[in-house]
């Protein structure tokens, strides 16, 4: 976590059972002196609430590419410029696929495509999803684009299975 000390970190939280771990990540980043802004995907809000995230980050939670708060501001550009680094934890197979194919349909994927900052991805998914040929191809693409992967780990999963796919 030393890389993330005393920096502006944009944390993107995708939808998956591991999303609850992002709350601890926010706490650790803040403890290390970093400022943390967050983006929640639509499905992430099924696992963690904007209130929990904003309470820990002490910042507004971003979740919509078309924000009614300030129509003149382009959140995907301003957030990308603000961040020293971007951490996506957890990142799902769906978001990996979106970014690898250049799909920019929501705020999270748009920020990732618009950024020239270092981007770290912490995958979390079922072992069969992690091992699927499409996922493997997309991971190779993203690594070639310069994205850094953190994990996943091998272990027991929420679905009751064991294997590689746990968020590190």
What is each PLM-predicted segment?
Residues 1-120, 126-168:
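A cross-family phosphate/adenosyl-ligand binding-site feature
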């Amino acid at each position: 976590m030393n890389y993330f000390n005393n920096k502006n970190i944009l944390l993107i939280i995708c939808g998956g059972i591991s999303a609850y771990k992002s709350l601890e990540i926010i706490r650790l980043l803040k403890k290390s002196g970093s400022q943390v802004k967050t983006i929640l995907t639509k499905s992430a809000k099924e696992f963690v609430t904007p209130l929990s995230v904003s309470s820990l980050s002490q910042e507004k939670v971003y979740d919509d590419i078309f924000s009614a708060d300030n129509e003149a501001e382009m959140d995907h550009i301003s957030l990308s410029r603000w961040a020293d680094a971007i951490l996506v934890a957890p990142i799902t197979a769906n978001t990996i696929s979106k970014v690898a194919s250049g799909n920019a349909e929501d705020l999270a994927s748009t920020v990732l495509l618009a950024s020239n900052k270092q981007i770290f991805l912490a995958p979390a998914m079922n072992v069969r999803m992690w091992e699927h040929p499409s996922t493997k191809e997309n991971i190779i693409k993203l690594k070639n684009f310069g994205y850094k992967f953190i994990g996943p780990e091998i272990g027991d999963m929420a679905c009751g299975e064991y294997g590689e796919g746990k968020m590190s």
